Amino acid sequence: LTALFEHERAACAQDVVAAQDLTVFVLRDDCDTHELQTIARKMISERFTIVDEVALDTTARSRVMSQTRGGNWIEKYRPEPVQPIIAIICRDAAEQGPLPIAMSAAKLAKRYPHLKKTDVLMKRVIRDHINLVAPLAHDRVVLHATDNPLETVETLRAIFGEDASAFLAI
């Protein structure tokens, strides 16, 4: 498995360099109204510059669900998988803001071992806020976000397929 991982990393090394300052947020279909999506976008834009937004077609949804780490696409409260619906591609801030959640450095390292930039933890603040303003019988996960440049490349490849490298070259 390690050899396969290293082979894939080498194959996308140029794209990883191009993705150093990018983060991708993927809204899920449990962020199910225009109002909730607007809240998520606004909160994302407090820490990131949104550079593109892509409504995911069936093929991209399937690739995102099967080819990316995380996302929690299977939820116990519903029989069918949660679908990724919108990708929000962002440029990271030049300087990371204060840690958006209360967590010790040790717990942060244990819970998010691949995390490169702490601003991405805004996803937890966004989830909490949406669950507060639009409560259900269960908590919504609402969105997924990439933790590092390699995950960003993997997610962009799932979204754009063979055109991911061309997107990164822009």
Predicted region positions:
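Non-catalytic terminal and connector segments of soluble metabolic enzymes
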Residues: 1-170
